[in-house]
From Swiss-Prot:
Stated name of the protein: Protein Wnt-2
Record PTM: Palmitoleoylation is required for efficient binding to frizzled receptors. Depalmitoleoylation leads to Wnt signaling pathway inhibition.
Entry function: Ligand for members of the frizzled family of seven transmembrane receptors. Functions in the canonical Wnt signaling pathway that results in activation of transcription factors of the TCF/LEF family. Functions as a upstream regulator of FGF10 expression. Plays an important role in embryonic lung development. May contribute to embryonic brain development by regulating the proliferation of dopaminergic precursors and neurons.
Glycosites: 295
Disulfide bonds: 76-87, 127-135, 137-157, 206-220, 208-215, 278-309, 294-304, 308-348, 324-339, 326-336, 331-332
Extent of the signal sequence: 1-25
Any one Gene Ontology molecular-function term assigned to this protein's record: frizzled binding
Tagged with keyword Endoplasmic reticulum: no
Compartmental location: Secreted, Extracellular space, Extracellular matrix; Secreted
Family statement: Belongs to the Wnt family.
Main location group: secreted
Gene Ontology terms describing biological process: atrial cardiac muscle tissue morphogenesis; canonical Wnt signaling pathway; cardiac epithelial to mesenchymal transition; cardiac muscle cell proliferation; cell fate commitment; cell proliferation in midbrain; cell-cell signaling; cellular response to transforming growth factor beta stimulus
Gene3D superfamilies with a match to the protein in the record: 3.30.2460.20
UniProt source species: Mustela putorius furo (European domestic ferret)
Gene encoding the protein: WNT2
Length: 360
């Protein structure tokens, strides 16, 4: 059993290096690795020396980061679910997204931001759950404090988000800090915006103590909000992302259009306009929209007109099982029948050109 696995791990770095574009965050592939920490650290291609050092030194943190990859990729797919590019991932590509992120587009800006945020979230959560040797609950949240409602005692387990941010910065930014080009600066900016987004939704939760809930004493702690809050916030930043160009000395950005404001540390920035993602394009990494489900009654990005890029759509009748004739029974249950429902599903037609199906 061990011999075949050893052979796979021996060839994996060479295979992935050959298949993968240069511009990518190689640590994203950690979601697909398993086994010992040494196997994981040594067989994720593209990690720089600082990342490998941290990987070997903190295998428990790496496991948390690897589990977090699935969470932030799911969040990315949720946010883009109604768009032509839907944050689709490629199983045999350690960049996860293929060539689409080679372009310094607003989609790249979002992915780097949400992935950086995902690392902060995953590490901080693992700290609070006692899964990491190097951190625990926030040690600064002790003693008595005061807010608008009066005095309270710090108690429970406050999320140690400062540790999550510090480790995420050291690990995620390590590769970009080795580069001095424009794309590295863009990635660093968006990585930071993602980290700041998680901390933005840190909230204070309290529990009252006293006779009949009189709240004569309050115990409070700081907790991260659900990751969806961060995803929604970064989605708004994606829609308001600011196109920039490098300044003359190559140390920072200036807005491409002087009518727009200078980006803040919370904004997402990008250099290049996005492709339309209408057709499968090997160079752009676009899978196209042929076969994508569209909404016939929508006027948004998921409408058949927009999603299908004017190519039209096919309609098929499908049946699905739904709950129907639900009744409330005392006490206290709702009982339903299983019913078959017929509905029309609309999918985008393929382009008429013969080369639309060229593999990406």
């Amino acid at each position: 059993m061990n011999a075949p696995l050893g052979g796979i791990w021996l060839w994996l770095p060479l295979l992935l290096t050959w298949l993968t574009p240069e511009v990518s965050s190689s640590w994203w592939y950690m979601r697909a690795t398993g086994g010992s920490s040494r196997v994981m650290c040594d067989n994720v291609p593209g990690l720089v020396s600082r990342q490998r050092q941290l990987c070997h030194r903190h295998p428990d943190v790496m496991r948390a980061i690897g589990l977090g990859v699935a969470e932030w990729t799911a969040e990315c797919q949720h946010q883009f679910r109604q768009h032509r590019w839907n944050c689709n991932t490629l199983d045999r590509d350690h960049s996860l997204f293929g060539r689409v992120l080679l372009r310094s587009s607003r989609e790249s800006a979002f992915v780097y931001a949400v992935s950086s945020a995902g690392v902060v979230f995953a590490i901080t959560r693992a700290c609070s759950q006692g899964e990491l040797k190097s951190c625990s609950c926030d040690p600064k949240k002790k003693g008595t404090a005061k807010d608008s409602k009066g005095n309270f005692d710090w108690g429970g387990c406050s999320d140690n988000i400062d540790y999550g941010i510090k480790f995420a910065r050291a690990f995620v930014d390590a590769k970009e800090r080795k580069g001095k080009d424009a794309r590295a600066l863009m990635n660093l900016h968006n990585n930071r915006a993602g980290r700041k987004a998680v901390k933005r939704f840190l909230k204070q939760e309290c529990k009252c103590h006293g006779v009949s809930g009189s709240c004569t004493l309050r115990t409070c702690w700081l907790a991260m909000a659900d990751f969806r809050r961060t995803g929604d916030y970064l989605w708004r930043k994606y829609n308001g992302a600011i196109q920039v160009v490098m300044n003359q000395d190559g140390t920072g950005f200036t807005v491409a259009n002087k009518r727009f404001k200078k980006p803040t540390k919370n904004d997402l920035v990008y250099f290049e306009n996005s492709p339309d993602y209408c057709i499968r394009d090997r160079d752009a990494g676009s899978p196209g929209t042929a076969g994508r489900v569209c909404n016939l009654t929508s006027r948004g990005m998921d409408s058949c007109e927009v999603m299908c890029c004017g190519r039209g759509y096919d309609t098929s009748r499908v049946t699905r099982m739904t709950k129907c004739e639900c009744k409330f029974h005392w006490c206290c249950a709702v009982r339903c029948q299983d019913c078959l429902e017929a509905l029309d599903v609309h999918t985008c037609k393929a382009p008429k050109s013969a080369d639309w199906a060229a593999p990406t």
